[in-house]
Amino acid sequence: MNSGKYVFSQILELVNRYEFEKIVKTHKGNYRVREFNCWNQFIQLFFGQLTNLNSLRDICLCLKAHNNKLYHLGIKNYVSHTTLSRANEKRDWQIFADFGYYLIELVRPLYKNSAVPNLSIENELFALDSTTISCSINLLIWAEGKYSRGAIKMHTLLD
C-alpha cells in the first residue's frame, strides 16, 4: 500500500501556483466561474499530458476511474468531458501560453551551456494539417455535413 505522496502531486508541487494565479488575474480567467477554475483546468490537462492520454474523454474517464484518489493527486473534483471541453473553448488560451513561456524562461538557464546537436534530415519533411471550416448552409447547399450544418474539410500540406 502506498504510504507516501503520489508522483503526480510531487510534480505538481514544482509548479508555481502563485505565478499561475498572477497570469490568470491579468487575463481575468476566473471571471464568473463557480467551481471549475483555471487551476483545476490546468491540473486536469497536465494530468492528461503526463499520462499520455489522447483526448479529453480519455482524461475524464481516467480521472473518474480514480475518483477516490483525486484529492491526493491535487485535483479538486472530477468534471465531465463536456465541462472540460467548454472550458477549453471559452477560456483565453493566452493564460496557458503565458504560463508556458514563464516555465520555459524558468528552465532556460539550466540548458544554456548544453550543446545543441547538429540535426540533419536527409529526406524532405512535410506537415499535414486537416481543418474543418464552418460555412453557412444557406449559401453552400452542397457543403452540408453532419447535423445539417455546412462545412468544408481542407487539407494543407506544408514543406
Where are the model-predicted features located?
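Conserved, well-structured functional cores that handle cations and Mg-NTP chemistry
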Residues: M1-D159
